[in-house]
Amino acid sequence: RYALAILAIVYMFNFIDRQILAILLPAIREEFGVSDAWLGFLTGTAFAMFYIILGIPVARYADRHNRRNLIALAVAVWSGMTALSGMAANFVQLALARIGVGVGEAGCSPPAHSMIADLYPPEKRSTAMGVYTIGISAGIMLAYLLGGWVAQNVGWREALLVVGLP
């Protein structure tokens, strides 16, 4: 149960860092003067392209190596890249940092699913996966609540730093 709770919390942070950008887009548009198309690239393509490309190789790596360590590395990468997003001096730097978030987050789900499959017998696995995926909704909720509040009261950069540094 402890491992499952940790995995769900990790998944929650995964989605906080993934989704927070959505609520910050108006401030980013204002600062960098970019179009909706570029904001779409930032929130979609920049992240998803590398997440998709790396998903299978990361899963294969997880099959042969220590999954716990892979998840820890993934958390460090995506959290660091989220924090770097808040330090971007221009739109290109922000896009590169978001690509880094996608690279890091690609290392979460494959090893987590594999660990859950090993920890729970088939008759309990669906419940375990349900607990794990609570992290999705909790992360989205917290991204909007925390991100919106911090952005409104301090700034969009600080919102990314707050969620990226824990």
Question: Predicted regions: what is each one?
Answer:
Residues 28-29, 61-62, 146-154:
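Interfacial helix-cap and linker-helix signal at transmembrane-aqueous boundaries
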Residues 11, 44, 48, 75, ...:
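Small-residue-rich transmembrane alpha-helices and their cytosolic helix-loop interfaces
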Residues 53-89:
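Conserved MFS/SLC helix-loop-helix module at the cytosolic interface between two early adjacent transmembrane helices
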Residues 24-53:
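Extracellular/periplasmic helix-loop-helix junction of adjacent transmembrane segments
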Residues 19, 48-56, 106, 140-141:
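Residue-level signature of mid-helix packing/kink "hotspots" within the transmembrane helices
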Residues 97-137:
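Cytoplasmic helix-loop-helix junction between adjacent transmembrane helices
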Residues 33, 66, 87-93, 104, ...:
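Helix-breaking motifs and short loop linkers at transmembrane-helix boundaries and internal kinks
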Residues 158-166:
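Symmetry-related core transmembrane helices of the 12-TM Major Facilitator Superfamily/SLC fold
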